[in-house]
Structure formats: structure tokens, C-alpha cells
Amino acid sequence: MKIEKLTPEREAQIAVYRDRYFALATSTERADRPRAEAAARAMAEIAGVKVNSVVWAATPQDGQREYENAWASLRASLGASLRASLWASLWASLWASLRDSLRDSDWTAFYIYAQEQLAVVYDERSANVLRLHNEIAASCFALWIAPGTVILCERPTKCEVVGGKLVNVEWE
């Protein structure tokens, strides 16, 4: 059934979801590490990545650095003759698995709203990925998946919001 117009009640719920996800994005509560790690491992499994380690980063910059180091380590460990073909195959496989879920990660609130308020039904895999994105959003700041590892980022220690806009973020 196609929805042409939202009812006033459903329209009012948009602000509730926006506020909920803005609060999650600007939360300075410590990460719920067990919850985040469980969701991250499940996301990696969906992507076909066997997780050997979980790394916690203090800042997004540290997380990005860990992610780049994980990929650099893999490239360095491969012999030159094997590197190109294995790299292309691994990257294509990982990207194909993650592309759809990661591309829209900023839209978690939109898809959750549609699921909960508009009774949109997603296929089982998509619903599971959405649930896991929601778990990540509710439990830590960010997630990176690399070969053999997942990297999670702790939440900031300070988020300054002025007039509904984020103006300053600090990490320890």
C-alpha cells in the first residue's frame, strides 16, 4: 500500500525520531561496550568477515587510523604476486556485502521510523542490518569493519549544541 500523505500523528512522530537519533549522535554517555561489540561482530559476520579482534578507539581519528592500519597490514602481508588478485577479490567481496548497509547508515532513523510507524516490512537480511545499525547508534559513536577486526569508537566527552545545532565536540 502506497502512502500518499502522513497523518498529523505520524508527522508529529518524525520529530520524536529526529530528536531520539540526534540525542544518540550527541550522547556523551560512555559506550555500552558489550552491546556495541555484539552488534559489530554480527555486522562483520553478515559481511563475511571473521573477527579476530575488537579494537576500541578513543576518537574517530584514532578509529580511522586503526582501520587504515588494518588494511595496510593485510596488504603488507601479501606477497607481491598474490596481492593484486587477492586484494581485488577480497575488496569486491567485502564491498558487495557492506555497500548497501553502510551507504545509508545516516538514514537509520528514517528506516526505523518507516518500520515502526508506517509498518514497512523489510526483507530478513535488511531488517537484521537495520537492527544492528540501530544497536551501533545506541551503544557507541562509530564502527569500522576491516579484515579480521572491528574497530569501535567511544563516544565524545562533550557535545555542545546551540539552537539545535552541534557546534563543538570533544574527546578525551
Labelled PLM ranges:
Residues M1-E172:
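Short, glycine-biased loop/turn motifs at secondary-structure junctions and
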